[in-house]
């Protein structure tokens, strides 16, 4: 692939100025390249990188952005063809890059707070609550305190005010008050995402304030209920119109008339809500037709003259009517306003005149047919008048509750196609009717007096709820301040406070103005995932006249609603900017990531599924992915493989299974099917294209990623893949604590804390750590049945020693002896572990368990051992981070973990590298921003979350809170407000579900596979039932499927099925398997307008037998390959083997006498002179030990710090260690480094008990200061962010590279571990620094310098090698800083 060549749209995004710009960047459209290149162009135009703000979504994205900008600047600097002034300016910008604000919003807020904390009276010494569980525990502790106070001070019921006790009763169950606890914390989280949390909380009761006037004038009705019902009715009208068209096209005129009456009913209901405008009424007037005037009397009938007079007047009225309608339509076409009062007067006049004619006909006793004609005329006028009359709630409610739907007659006979159409129309009509009934039940159950009464009581509850939540929030904020901790949302609120100066603070206001002037350009990446508070912060840094905002995102990829991300911020600007209002919208639609099979398949799905109603944005031409990854075409062998849709039907051939097994069987079978397909890809060496070398390569396991919606399936997935011997790495394991190895460790930790816990104890005894059998466990219990199991174990030990065992006949004497030995060994370990738990850290305890039980190594040898070891390492790491928090000790750690489990918080295991040759599994959310050659979207039949409808209280940031109300008699009333909030939540969730599907599909580069599973005995999960739902796609001939089938979909697969059902490749015959036969709809031939011609997909259903056969064939192929290779072996292989065994000599004898682990400190001593004064002795005996034993380790252990004497004269090692600590901790971003500054830092470290005062007095302060006056030190001060201190590393080296005496043939690998004092990343490469306290004799300066350099050369060479491996860029300088001389001594070449 060549260098970056922007498309026209990318060029606009890079070069347009003078407007706020919103870039809608579809997946794979090169938005990062746009951001980087825009930054470079702005710099070329004279802006400075340190006067820009570039906000990213993650720290990794910020680092990536900074690195790319640096690389782009370096490229300009290194290009000698560029003018010198340009290169100099770019070089200057590289120097400024470290100080540039390229960070997450939280990092930027933290920087603001650290700089301006004094404005808001905040103590700058705080710790961030980065651990979610620690934050949760702290919240629960504070809420417990608050709720206890509220319980103690609970008041009696006061009229017009709810008490705390009523709040608890209303929102808690009969078992506990967890419901209220959860609601308070949920309200806190949502409020915290608002610019003014307390204001948001105070407004919560407003939805239940129906005012003193008409209910129809209330805010709730006008702003929530009315728009919601109007939207629903319009959806029904749209669906009915499509059904009318289908009925008419197939000659079903009677059915069409009935469905048309349904549509007219919806129009009438719409008009009752005030949803009909004057313009709508004019259009309906134009559609009205006067019927014939019947019932003419005979010529000799005396009533004939009256009839003729009425007929003449009616004809005149008809003519006047037509003229009036024409006039109003003309005004509409000319876009002239039509006054409602004017139209109302006209219609009233016509209605009165028709009423007069009707009265005259009745009084004259004209024929009934004549009277009927005039009644219809008058009724038509009255209905039009009613459309313009203000309704009441009760009349509306009655209209909805009493709506009648006609019976659909006219069923065709002897016409199969017409019968099928008629049947589908009836089914669709029934579905719409069901949706309408649900609408009525949810919103039109109460008359106005009932509605008001329930709302009043609910409002009282919400006032109390709001007050309690505000109380909790204030207490929690104060607790955090008292403990000097802040959470991420606090950073945002305090930053917002800094940027919002009071009116009476002119200096503060000037500071904010200066900040606004400082940032010449504000660029926001992933703008679609911004919340309202973050938006407010960023808007405070600009002003309308500056027009310096550049926002990049893709609302189709907004998938963080659960974190309070608000995609409507993006949508609002996008719609306004596209209309030329306030800014410029630019669309990046080219996809440089995926092959045409992925882009085409994605388009054919979303052009049928996504619009503003479902997805919140139209999938129009701009939104379509445009294939632009033309580099795939560089290799002619690179064939486009269609997207695969693989369906697994769990019991298509086995309907006898019990219900309880269905879900497990369904998922397990799907996972085996996936494993089969992966094995086919890998073992059949299916090819993919590698853009790096332009060649085709066989698919490897590491090329494949499985994307999932939920982590809950991971344990089952790992189990099935282990059986198939497919290597698997799972990212973010759900139910981490359910993994066997983790459960065993947690059980062991629990009994170390308290062994008198039966279940954990038995779990450990049964585990491989002890290895008791069920029979042995039972034998122990029989020794004493009346005590806990630990006491029974003690009884067994005592009885064995006293030879008084009970029920001894159950085991042989050998078995009893073996049991005693295992139990004795375990109890010995338990004693040691319990002692460690009391005296040492938790980390030490866990590592001791791994070491002394060998459990870490054991699980590594199990199937899936790689992942199991990662799980145990994660527990160790979690314990380490736990000990950095405010919680301490084993008991608290166990409580900590139990809380994590209660709240479904996982450790989020960081497994091995993604590039390892294993199949990787991650959530769709975890994959965002990544791309993979082969993507499986698995478990696509997993049901959507629709739990909101079951909650007593539901919360939405925009719609507010909706609750059920329980009266004094404990009767529960639902409220229309709650149903309105549920509707808003579900609408948002379905829109986000659709966007999550989009993200999943667009991760794929070359292959895309979608899988799902079904169960025929469960109606909602059966393939047959799903197939019927997918057939609803035929209800519309339009490309966009009707709203109802899309809204009522239950899973990703439902959406995929709806879109693909319109293609012949997705047919009943293709998908039927075993005893499940799907019926092809006769509507399948329906022509859909705009449907893509080449869908690029295949679909197939598998049964358990199909998967077994497929796996067997793969095994046969593998066996055949092995047999073929074996046949090429020489016939005398057996003789050769025997001779090899007899003559064998182990080639690494020397290595058996050498340790496989060496520290750099120890290796360094092999190179250095042994006469260093006051250092740890490396004496003759030790060197002899090296020669004879090959052990390169220091046997002199340091004296533990807690028993060191503080009065002795410090030795060089102590001073050296303390000096290194000062170098490590010294702040480098303060500018000037002088002796006073260094001394302050040393005293600070003494105060923190990190340095002994006696040792501190001997630290060479002048030597430290002098380092930062050297050329290297000055570079470090200019770029402190690029200087890395005390960096640990481990690497593996060959033995012959380290030690003499190890022959080349004895090339054993040795693990080297060390800590690098410091290194600086520069444009040219790395500068490696090592500090030394060595004494030099000034009379022999040159001699001593040469000696010191020779001593440490080997050590620095090892560091250099490690840095080359770690950083991937060369070490261009390395040297020793000698504190005694105050000089930086460079190593230039070997032997200098």
From Swiss-Prot:
Coiled coil: none
Binding residues for ATP: 25-32
Catalysed reactions listed for this entry: Couples ATP hydrolysis with the unwinding of duplex DNA by translocating in the 3'-5' direction; ATP + H2O = ADP + phosphate + H(+)
Gene Ontology BP annotations: double-strand break repair via homologous recombination
Domain UvrD-like helicase C-terminal: 623-929
SUPFAM superfamilies for the chain: P-loop containing nucleoside triphosphate hydrolases, Restriction endonuclease-like
E.C. code: 3.1.-.-, 5.6.2.4
Membrane-spanning segments: none
Single GO cellular component term: cytosol
Cofactors: Mg(2+)
Pfam families per record: AAA_19 (PF13245), UvrD-helicase (PF00580), UvrD_C (PF13361)
Keyword flag DNA repair: yes
Any GO MF annotation of the entry: 3'-5' DNA helicase activity
Keyword annotations from UniProtKB, A to Z: ATP-binding, DNA damage, DNA repair, DNA-binding, Exonuclease, Helicase, Hydrolase, Isomerase, Nuclease, Nucleotide-binding
Annotated ranges, domain UvrD-like helicase ATP-binding: 4-595
Gene3D superfamilies recorded: 1.10.10.160, 3.90.320.10, 6.10.250.2380, P-loop containing nucleotide triphosphate hydrolases (3.40.50.300)
Described function: The heterodimer acts as both an ATP-dependent DNA helicase and an ATP-dependent, dual-direction single-stranded exonuclease. Recognizes the chi site generating a DNA molecule suitable for the initiation of homologous recombination. The AddA nuclease domain is required for chi fragment generation; this subunit has the helicase and 3' -> 5' nuclease activities.
Binding partners and assembly: Heterodimer of AddA and AddB/RexB.
Entry similarity comment: Belongs to the helicase family. AddA subfamily.
HAMAP family xref list: AddA
Protein name: ATP-dependent helicase/nuclease subunit A
Organism in which the protein naturally occurs: Limosilactobacillus reuteri (strain DSM 20016) (Lactobacillus reuteri)
Underlying gene: addA
């Amino acid at each position: 692939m060549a260098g970056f060549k922007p498309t026209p749209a990318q060029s606009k995004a890079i070069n347009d100025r003078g407007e706020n710009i919103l870039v809608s960047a579809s997946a794979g459209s090169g938005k990062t390249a746009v951001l980087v290149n825009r930054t470079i162009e702005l710099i070329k135009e004279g802006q400075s990188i340190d006067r820009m703000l570039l906000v990213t979504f993650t720290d990794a994205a910020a680092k990536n952005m900074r690195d790319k900008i640096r690389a782009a600047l370096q490229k300009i600097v290194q290009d000698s063809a560029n003018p010198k002034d340009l290169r100099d300016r770019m070089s200057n910008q590289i120097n400024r890059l470290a100080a540039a604000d390229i960070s997450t919003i939280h990092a930027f807020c933290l920087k603001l707070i650290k700089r301006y904390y004094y404005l808001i009276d905040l103590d700058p010494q705080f710790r961030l609550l980065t651990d979610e569980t620690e934050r949760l525990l702290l919240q629960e502790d504070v809420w417990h305190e608050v709720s206890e106070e509220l319980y103690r001070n609970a008041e009696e019921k006061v009229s017009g005010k709810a008490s705390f006790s009523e709040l608890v009763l209303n929102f808690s169950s009969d078992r506990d008050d967890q419901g209220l606890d959860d609601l308070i914390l949920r309200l806190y989280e949502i409020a915290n995402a608002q610019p003014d949390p307390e204001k948001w909380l105070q407004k919560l009761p407003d939805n239940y304030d129906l005012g003193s006037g008409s209910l129809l004038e209330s805010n709730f009705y006008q702003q929530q209920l009315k728009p919601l019902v109007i939207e629903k009715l319009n959806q029904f009208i749209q669906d009915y119109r499509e059904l009318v068209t289908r009925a008419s096209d197939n000659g079903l005129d009677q059915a069409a008339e009935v469905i048309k009456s349904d549509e007219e009913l919806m129009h009438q209901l719409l008009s009752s809500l005030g949803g009909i405008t004057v313009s709508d009424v004019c259009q309906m007037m134009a559609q009205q037709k006067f019927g014939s005037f019947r019932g003419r009397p005979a010529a000799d009938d005396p009533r004939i003259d009256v009839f003729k007079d009425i007929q003449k007047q009616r004809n005149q009225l008809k003519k006047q009517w037509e003229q009036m309608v024409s006039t109003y339509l003309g005004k509409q076409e000319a876009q002239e306003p039509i006054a409602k009062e004017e139209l109302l007067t006209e219609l009233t006049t016509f209605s009165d005149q028709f009423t007069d004619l009707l009265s005259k006909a009745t009084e004259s006793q004209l024929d009934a047919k004549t009277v009927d004609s005039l009644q219809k005329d008058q009724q038509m006028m009255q209905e039009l008048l009613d459309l313009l009359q203000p309704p009441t709630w009760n009349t509306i409610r009655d209209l909805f509750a009493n709506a009648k739907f006609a019976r659909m007659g006219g069923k065709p006979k002897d016409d199969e196609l017409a019968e099928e159409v008629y049947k589908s129309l009836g089914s669709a009509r029934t579905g719409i009717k069901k949706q309408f009934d649900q609408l009525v039940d949810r919103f039109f159950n109460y008359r106005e007096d009932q509605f008001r009464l329930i709302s009043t009581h609910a409002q009282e509850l919400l006032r109390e709820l709001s007050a309690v939540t505000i109380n909790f929030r204030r207490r929690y904020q104060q607790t955090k301040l008292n403990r000097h901790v802040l959470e991420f949302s606090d950073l945002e609120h305090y930053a917002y406070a800094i940027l919002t100066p009071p009116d009476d603070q002119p200096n503060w206001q000037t500071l904010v103005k200066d900040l606004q002037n400082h940032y010449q350009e504000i660029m926001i990446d992933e703008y679609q995932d911004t919340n309202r508070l973050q938006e407010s912060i960023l808007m405070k840094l600009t002003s309308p006249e500056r027009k310096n905002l550049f926002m990049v995102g893709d609302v189709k990829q907004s998938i963080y609603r659960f974190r309070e991300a608000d995609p409507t911020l993006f949508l609002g600007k996008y719609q306004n900017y596209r209309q030329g209002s306030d800014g410029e919208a630019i669309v990046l639609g080219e996809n440089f990531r995926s092959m045409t099979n992925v882009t085409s398949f994605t388009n054919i799905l979303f052009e049928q599924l996504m619009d503003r109603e479902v997805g919140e944005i139209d999938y129009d031409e701009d939104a379509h992915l445009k294939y632009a990854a033309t580099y795939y075409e560089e290799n002619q062998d690179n064939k486009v493989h269609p997207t695969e849709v693989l369906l697994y039907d769990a019991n298509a051939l086995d309907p006898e299974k019990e219900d309880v097994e269905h879900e497990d069987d369904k998922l397990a079978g799907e996972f085996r099917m996936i494993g089969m397909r992966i094995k086919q890809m890998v073992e059949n060496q299916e090819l993919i294209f590698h853009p790096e070398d332009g060649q085709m390569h066989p698919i490897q396991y590491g090329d494949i990623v499985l994307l999932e919606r939920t982590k809950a399936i991971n344990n089952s997935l790992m189990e099935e893949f282990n059986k198939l011997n497919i290597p698997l790495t799972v990212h973010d394991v759900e139910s981490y604590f359910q993994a066997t190895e983790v459960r065993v460790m947690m059980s062991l930790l629990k009994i170390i804390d308290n062994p008198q816990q039966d279940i954990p104890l038995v779990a450990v005894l049964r585990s491989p750590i002890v290895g008791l059998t069920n029979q042995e466990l039972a034998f122990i219990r029989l020794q004493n049945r009346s005590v806990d199991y630990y006491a029974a174990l003690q009884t067994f030990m005592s009885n064995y020693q006293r030879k008084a065992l009970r029920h001894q006949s159950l085991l042989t004497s050998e078995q009893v002896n073996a049991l005693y030995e295992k139990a004795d060994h375990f109890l010995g370990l338990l004693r040691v572990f319990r002692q460690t738990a009391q005296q040492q850290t938790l980390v030490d305890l866990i590592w001791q368990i791994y070491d002394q039980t060998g459990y870490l190594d054991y699980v590594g040898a199990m199937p899936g051992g790689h992942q199991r070891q990662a799980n145990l390492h994660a527990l160790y790491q979690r314990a380490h981070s736990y000990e950095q928090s405010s919680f301490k000790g084993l008991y608290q750690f166990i409580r900590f973990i139990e809380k994590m489990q209660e709240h479904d918080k996982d450790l989020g295991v960081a497994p091995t590298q993604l590039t390892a040759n294993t199949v990787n599994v991650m959530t769709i959310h975890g994959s965002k921003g990544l791309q993979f050659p082969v993507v499986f979207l698995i478990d696509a039949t997993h049901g959507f979350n629709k739990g909101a409808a079951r909650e007593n209280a539901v919360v939405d940031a925009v719609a507010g809170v909706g609750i059920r109300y329980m009266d004094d008699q404990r009767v529960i009333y639902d409220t229309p407000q709650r149903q309105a909030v549920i509707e808003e939540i579900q609408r948002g969730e379905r829109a986000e579900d659709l966007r999550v599907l989009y993200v999943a599909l667009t991760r794929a580069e070359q292959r895309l596979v979608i899988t799902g599973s079904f169960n025929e005995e469960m109606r909602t999960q059966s393939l047959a039932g799903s197939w019927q739902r997918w057939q609803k796609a035929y209800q519309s001939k339009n490309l966009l499927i009707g709203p109802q089938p899309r809204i009522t979909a239950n899973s990703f697969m439902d959406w995929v099925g709806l879109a693909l059902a319109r293609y012949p490749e997705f047919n009943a015959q293709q998908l039927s398997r075993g005893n499940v036969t799907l019926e092809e709809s006769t509507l399948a031939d329906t022509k859909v307008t705009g449907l893509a011609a080449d869908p690029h997909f295949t679909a197939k259903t598998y049964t358990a037998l199909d998967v077994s056969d497929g796996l067997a064939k793969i095994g046969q192929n593998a066996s055949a390959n092995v047999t073929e290779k074996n046949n090429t072996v020489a016939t005398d292989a057996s003789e050769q083997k025997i001779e090899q065994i007899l003559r064998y000599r182990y080639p690494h004898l020397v290595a058996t006498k050498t340790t496989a682990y060496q520290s750099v400190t120890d290796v360094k001593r092999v190179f250095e002179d042994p006469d260093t004064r006051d250092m740890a002795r490396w004496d003759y005996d030790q060197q002899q030990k090296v020669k004879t034993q090959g052990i390169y380790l220091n046997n002199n252990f340091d004296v533990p710090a807690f028993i060191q004497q503080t009065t002795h004269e410090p030795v060089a090692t102590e001073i050296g260690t303390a000096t290194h600590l000062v170098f490590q901790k010294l702040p480098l971003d303060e500018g000037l480094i002088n002796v006073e500054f260094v001394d302050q830092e040393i005293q600070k470290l003494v105060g923190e008990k990190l340095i002994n005062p006696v040792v501190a007095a001997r630290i060479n302060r002048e030597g430290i200061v002098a380092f930062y006056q050297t050329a290297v030190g000055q570079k470090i001060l200019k770029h402190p962010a690029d200087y890395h201190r005390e960096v640990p590393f481990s690497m593996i080296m060959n033995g012959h590279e380290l030690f003499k005496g190890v022959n080349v043939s004895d090339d054993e690998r040795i693990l080297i571990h060390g800590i690098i004092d410091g290194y600086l990343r520069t444009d040219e490469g790395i500068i490696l620094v090592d500090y030394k306290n060595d004494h030099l004799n000034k009379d022999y300066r040159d001699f001593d310098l040469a000696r010191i350099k020779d001593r440490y050369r080997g050590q620095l060479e090892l560091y250099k090698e490690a840095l080359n491996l770690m950083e991937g860029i060369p070490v261009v300088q390395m040297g020793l800083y000698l504190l005694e001389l105050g000089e930086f001594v460079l190593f230039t070449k070997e032997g200098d």
